[in-house]
Every structure is written in structure tokens, then in C-alpha cells.
Amino acid sequence: MINRQLSRLLLCSILGSTTLISGCALVRKDSAPHQQLKPEQIKLADDIHLASSGWPQAQWWKQLNDPQLDALIQRTLSGSHTLAEAKLREEKAQSQADLLDAGSQLQVAALGMLNRQRVSANGFLSPYAMDAPALGMDGPYYTEATVGLFAGLDLDLWGVHRSAVTAAIGAHNAALAETAAVELSLTTGVAQLYYSMQASYQMLDLLEQTRDVIDYAVKAHQSKVAHGLEAQVPFHGARAQILAVDKQIAAVKGQITETRESLRALIGAGASDMPEIKPVALPRVQTGIPATLSYELLARRPDLQAMRWYVQASLDQVDSARALFYPSFDIKAFFGLDSIHLDTLFKKTSRQFNFIPGLKLPLFDGGRLNANLEGTRAASNMMIERYNQSVLNAVRDVAVNGTRLQTLNDEREMQAERVEATRFTQRAAEAAYQRGLTSRLQATEARLPVLAEEMSLLMLDSRRVIQSIQLMKSLGSGYQAAPVVEKK
């Protein structure tokens, strides 16, 4: 007897093992994941030589010591609709991860049901259609009642749901990094617009000084014409100059208005609550990039962090797609009361218990699982290639912005010498006028070349400030990867 039972148990074990092995669908084609760029490949070309400096600090704008800029950025971070949208994407990604995680947990539900029915005299339950109280049948009408608890659990032995949850958590981490990228874009955008506006204020001041000089020349030539001391050609030439300057002044004023409106939209200000922006001097620019990039650039660029998390999530999705080829197991159970008579529903004899283990074997699916795996793998490899290109683009941004800033610094040094040279000429003209060697008009007009060179210097300074902010942005502007969100 015992040997027979052991034989049956052995036979069941062999059949069960054979069923599990044969129950796995065949993976016809699955390519290897594409390679990601190695950190040692993340470096600048050998012929790019820039001053060495540390990484930007968090809240980098505070180092500029500009209260107006501080207030604008704080208002942007607290009231930007773009940033609010990014934070809502965080919440959406979190809820998606929670939803998938909840689906892999034990599910328990209370069940209550009433079923008023008439039993067919010709069906499978035809005996219950009789009206025979002695036999416990008072058909053909019955009111069946069921109350109890229903539970279900997917055992997820191969990690179908587990990998899907991990992928969703990766997408949530990516959303966190994307929010940081939005903050970075907003802060640098506000700073660039703010200093563009400050440069326009200074340009307007230089143009108005230029206009004053030319206006004096117009009046001087007009007086000479009125006294018959010279022809009208110099007078009309000066008039043409002043009209050209007026045109430039109008253009700069329009540029200030456009910049202000762009800034208004970025900080989320309304038509009547835009803060007044007073003129201040442009800040001094610090030139330089870190000595090495490598891992640090990956960790300090929020867009690269987001891409890295999307790559990891795509690999987890591939794992989930592969796990679908294996048998799945689940357990369902019911415990409660069931009776075809309401008056006996809550009696001890109405208790019912069901225990239903389930097994699903993916034998024939018409290629659905392979197509799903192939598509998921292709999407993952696409994400890896996009990530690799993003890393290369990030290195390019650092190299290009750093080189441009260094070039602007060199140009600024030469332009500063030109300004000093024209100032020397102006001082010489002033000295000659003081000694009575030249007229006051000539001494005054000697100021025009100085103003022209100062405008060129101002444009270089403005471009340097904007470029330095762009370089900080390409270096992450003080971003540090946030702590990883893990499964609760």
C-alpha cells in the first residue's frame, strides 16, 4: 500500500516537472542589450584647454549677490506652471508604481449576492424544480444567498509583476530628475533674461550719452550755418547721425519691453504684479570647468539622470516580458456562507470554503509573447542609444560653451585695450581744448569713439555673462542626484 502511494507520488512529481518544463513558451529571438557609454569615455578632447575650476554650487545665483535676481528666481520656483506640471508628473509616476505594486499583493474582497431564480424542470438541476418539502425541495423558485470573503494572490515566481513594479519605480525616479531639469532650465532662463535686460539698460544709457554728444554737434553746426561760417553739409550729416542713434534707442527700448514680457511669462507674473527691475552692473564672470568629467557629469546633469533611469526601467520591462514565457501560478480562495434559503443562510451548515490553486501554461500563443519581447527589447535598445547620444551631447555642450566663454574672455581683453586707447585720444583732445588748440566741438566729438568702443565692450560683457550661465547649465548648475526612490 505504501509502495503504491510512493509510486503515485513519484509519478505525479515526474508529470508535474515535465509539465512545468514543457509549459515554458519558446523564446525564438532575443538580442543582447546595447552597450552604454563607459564613464572613462566622458571627457573633453585633448586640444581643448580651459581654466580648471570646481563644479557649480547649488543655488549658484546667490553667489552673484543680486537681491533682484534672488527674488525673481524664488518667485519662479514657487509660482511656475511649468514646474507645477513637472511635479504633477512625479505624482502620476508615483501613483502608477503604487498601482502596479498593489496588483501584486494579496487581494481580499467582501462578497454579498442574492440570486432569485426559477429552476428548469428539464435542466441539470431538474430535481430541484419539484415541490417536495419532505425532500428539502420547495421549487421551482429559490432565493440563493452568498456572503463571505474572496481572496486572490499571484505568486509571481518569475518576476513578471516584480519587474514591472521596478520599471515603474525607475520611471518615478526619472520623473524626479526631470523636475530638477525643469528647475535648472527655469533658473538659468530667468538669469539670462534678467542680465540681458540689464545689458539693454546699460546700452540705452550709452546711446543716450551718444545722442547728447551728437545733439551738441547739431546745435554747433546749426549756429555756424546761421552765421554763415560753414556750409550745411556738416549740419545735415550730424542730423543723420542723431536720427540713426534715435533709431537704435527705439530698438533697445523695444528689446527691453520684449525681454520684460518674456521674463513675466517665465516667472508667472500677471499684467499688474510684475516686479520693477532696476538697473545694476553686470557681474564678473568666472571662467573654468572641472578638471575631469566622467561619473560627475552623469550625476550632476538632471537630464542625464532621467535618461539613465529610463534606460534602467526599459531593462526591467524586458525582464518582465521574458518572465511571461514561464508558467504562472495563482491562488484563489473563498470563505463564507451559501444557502438556497434565506432563513438558513446564517446557520453553521451553510458554511462554504473554496481553495483554488491555478496554473497557466503558455503553450501556443501565435507568437504574441515573442513579438512582445522583441518590441520591448527594441524599445530598450532605442533608449540606450538615445542615452548614449545624450551623454555625447552633454560633453559637447561643456566643450562648446567653455570654448566660447574662453574666446569671449580673450576678445574682452583686446576690446578693453581698444577702449583705453580711445580714452587716451579723448583725453588728448580735452587737453588740447584746454590749451586753446582745438574747438570745444572737436573735444566733445572725441567722446564718440569712446562711447562706440564702450558699447562693443558692453556687448562682449553681456555675451560673457549669458555664456557663463549657459556653461553652468551644461555642468548641471549644482544639481546632485536625489536619493533613489525604492519599493516601499
UniProtKB/Swiss-Prot annotation:
InterPro entries, sorted: OMF, OMP_efflux, RND_efflux_OM_lipoprot_NodT
Localisation per UniProt entry: Cell outer membrane
The organism's place on the tree of life at top rank: Bacteria
Record-linked PROSITE patterns: PROKAR_LIPOPROTEIN (PS51257)
Signal peptide location: 1-23
GO biological process: response to antibiotic
Gene Ontology CC terms, in alphabetical order: cell outer membrane
Main location: membrane
One GO MF term attached to the UniProt entry: efflux transmembrane transporter activity
Membrane topology designation: Lipid-anchor
Covalent lipid sites (S-diacylglycerol cysteine): C24
Lipidation (N-palmitoyl cysteine): C24
Cited Gene3D superfamilies: Outer membrane efflux proteins (OEP)
Keyword list, A-Z: Antibiotic resistance, Cell outer membrane, Lipoprotein, Membrane, Palmitate, Signal, Transmembrane, Transmembrane beta strand
Family matches, as NCBIfam families: outer_NodT, PRK09915.1
Record family assignment: Belongs to the outer membrane factor (OMF) (TC 1.B.17) family.
UniProt subunit comment: Could be part of a tripartite efflux system composed of MdtN, MdtO and MdtP.
Biological role: Could be involved in resistance to puromycin, acriflavine and tetraphenylarsonium chloride.
PANTHER family for this protein: MULTIDRUG RESISTANCE OUTER MEMBRANE PROTEIN MDTP-RELATED, OUTER MEMBRANE CATION EFFLUX PROTEIN
Name of this protein: Multidrug resistance outer membrane protein MdtP
Species classification: Bacteria, Pseudomonadati, Pseudomonadota, Gammaproteobacteria, Enterobacterales
